[in-house]
Amino acid sequence: MGDVIMKQPDGGYHVTDGSNMLGGDYHKTIRASDGTIPEEDIKRYYDIAMKLDWQDGWYSSEEMKAQAKTSGYKHIHLGGHDTKREEYEIQQDWVKEIWEKVNPGMKLLRHYLNGHGKHQSGGIHLDGWTANQYTCIVYLTPGWEPEDGGSIEFWTPNLTDEQRAMAIKTPYGLNGDESKNIVKSYWPRAGRVVLFDGRIPHVARAVETDKFRVSLVFKGTTDEIKKEEEEPVKNTSKDPFKGTSIEGKD
């Protein structure tokens, strides 16, 4: 399905990807579960994550990075791509263990770690602009309590005209409800798994104590995607330099 042009209430027009109109009302496609991962494993995964090399100054979007209204949080890229839709294999054994427990039946596009310290938060954003894209978050900080803050909020998809144009099959489309409200919110209990449609506006609110909130994030799709391409292996059987340091080189 290609682009769809829709007339807005003010008489203007907006172009949206036609795939956004597939399926039904996505704004409540949010699920959470506890007890999927044993407590002793959570502690082990957290210890592994804390020994990794974290990158500072990360933001929820390039626009938020440019504005820098809040301090950036920490981040580790673990695999996959932001711009390419290719299925790939997870390289970290401990992450594979988690994915095997929480995979809702989607093909993985990207996975990474986010880390938020005291007073660090994200910004309201979307993870995807087309149908059939989902995000799965696993919270890994042991001993997290409600008073530690850091809850994730999910908002009505009407915060911008672009979101409203995309939300044509929800109650919040261009001619729908303009009230901006939180749909659901979850605190980051250790081991909690949260799954949601990538088109839902969401934000990780600030941590209130000295604890460090570690979130393992998986982004995937239920669409068919191609496998990650491997570098072709050259046939060097007739290479005159076979057995030397320049075998197979152009």
Label each region the model flagged.
Residues 2-105, 232-235, 241:
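Non-heme Fe(II)/2-oxoglutarate
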